[in-house]
Amino acid sequence: MIYVIDHNDSFTHNVVHQLALFDKVECDNYNKVSEKKIKQASTIVFSPGPGSPKNYPITSKIYKKFKGKKKMIGICLGFQHILFCEGAKIIEQKKIYHGYQSNIQVVNNKSLFQKGKIFKVGRYHSLKLKEPFKSNNFEITMRCLNSKVAMAFENKKEKIYGFQFHPESFLTINGNVLIKKILSA
């Protein structure tokens, strides 16, 4: 079972729909999380949402408690939140990307995806990872071709993955392939 933690975002319903193609999905609001469901889940997904990771201390507690015990995936705010919990600074971008399609490229040969591969993805974010960023076992694996902003990370050892973009968006080509690969890792 996949347990989605919803950060009050309309995209969460699309995320749930996409994940349901691969497994049973349960979804609860971040302030009504069920520890019983977390324990039953094979994967925890931190959804997109408004604001900054610092606005969701409950999500930080969940991440820290289950890190290394459950596979985790962060999407958009969820991507930022995982990195924030790992000590990263999340900052405003000069340009806001809401409903914007970008080309991103796999830049790391340790990635689950083939280095050099290019994907078209849907972006809906005004914040980004401030770099350089270093944390044990975390590798930036995809970047925007134009801006070089980090678009994905992987921590294979602890099975923690993140996408700054929205794999469930109609702007993302082959989003199901990306999710399936992460879920099967």
Cite the ranges covered by each PLM segment.
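Catalytic beta-strand/loop cores that center a nucleophilic Ser/Cys/Thr
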Residues: 110-158
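Short, charged N-terminal beta->alpha structural module
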Residues: 2-21
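Conserved hydrophobic/aromatic beta-strand scaffold that supports enzyme active sites
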Residues: 101-103, 150-152, 162
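Short amphipathic alpha-helix with an adjacent loop that forms part of the alpha/beta core around
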Residues: 33-41, 133-134
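Active-site environment of divalent metal-dependent phosphoester hydrolases
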Residues: 11, 127-130, 169-171
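A short, well-structured beta->alpha microelement
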Residues: 20-37
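Acyltransferase
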Residues: 167-185
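Cysteine-nucleophile active-site neighborhood
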Residues: 43-111, 120, 179
